[in-house]
């Protein structure tokens, strides 16, 4: 049984606060200048869900706790605005094709996909993936068994996964990545960074420093260093091999950019290449 509760047209929504179990939440661009919020409840009734706007905040939440499986709730928001968002789902996907401001997103077993964050982001998923196109502010993201993909981060980043891969495109701020079992790939590092994996490969395609620490217990480490950047190396592996393409150079002058690179692995190879 599908009960379509209705559509609310308003132009004064600045924030959304949504907490549902099963279902989905999606935010898309609007054709006009108004925000349209549509709610659909499946296997439930209108009385099961609060759906209202108060002081510029759209609120969607279940009105009671369900002993068994509750209704499936689908929330569709079309807006021209950059909304602040606090969204939590049990098993539903969260997606936004519009920029979000300050965002706190959480899902138990759904995926989180956001194209752009204008503020800061805190995102967590139990067994789903997290995808972020770009972020202006800080990013904190964690998954239990899903992957994390961040295209562009202009501020600090802290991400952790239990058993998923991590990919970051451009990391402009301080970056920390911790993975239990999975690969880490970062295309460009521009600030102090620490990346560690329990069992997986660590690959940094281009690192501009000023310091990078890359560690894995069972996996390979590969780091790309710009040609001509003075680099201090501290490389250690127990049973693997070390290959370094960098040429010995002079100590950098005072104020000259340099890189401190530390890499560790127990049973893998370490490769440092010029790029």
Task: Show the residue positions of the predicted features.
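Intrinsically disordered, low-complexity terminal regions
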Residues: 1-275
């Amino acid at each position: 049984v599908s009960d379509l509760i209705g559509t609310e047209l308003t132009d004064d929504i600045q924030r959304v606060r949504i907490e549902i179990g099963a279902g989905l939440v999606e935010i898309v661009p609007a054709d006009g200048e108004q925000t349209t919020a549509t709610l659909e409840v499946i296997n439930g009734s209108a009385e099961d869900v609060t759906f209202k706007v108060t002081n510029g905040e759209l609120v969607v939440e279940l009105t009671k706790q369900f002993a068994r499986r509750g209704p499936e709730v689908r929330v569709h928001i079309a807006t021209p605005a950059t909304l602040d968002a606090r969204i939590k789902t049990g098993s539903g996907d969260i997606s936004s094709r519009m920029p979000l401001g300050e965002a706190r997103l959480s899902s138990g077993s759904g995926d989180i996909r956001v194209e752009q964050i204008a503020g800061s982001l805190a995102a967590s998923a139990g067994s789903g993936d997290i995808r972020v196109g770009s972020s202006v502010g800080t990013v904190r993201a964690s998954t239990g068994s899903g992957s994390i993909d961040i295209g562009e981060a202009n501020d600090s980043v802290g991400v952790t996964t239990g058993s998923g891969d991590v990919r970051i495109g451009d990391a402009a701020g301080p970056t920390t990545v911790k993975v239990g079992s999975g690969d880490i790939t970062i295309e460009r590092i521009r600030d102090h960074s620490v990346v560690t994996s329990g069992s997986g490969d660590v690959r940094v395609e281009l690192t501009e420093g000023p310091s990078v620490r890359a560690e894995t217990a069972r996996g390979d480490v590969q780091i790309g260093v710009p040609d001509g950047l003075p680099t201090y190396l501290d490389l250690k592996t127990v049973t693997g091999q070390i290959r370094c393409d960098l040429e010995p150079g002079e100590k950098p002058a005072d104020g000259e950019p340099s890189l401190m690179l530390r890499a560790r692995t127990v049973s893998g190879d370490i490769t440092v290449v010029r790029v």
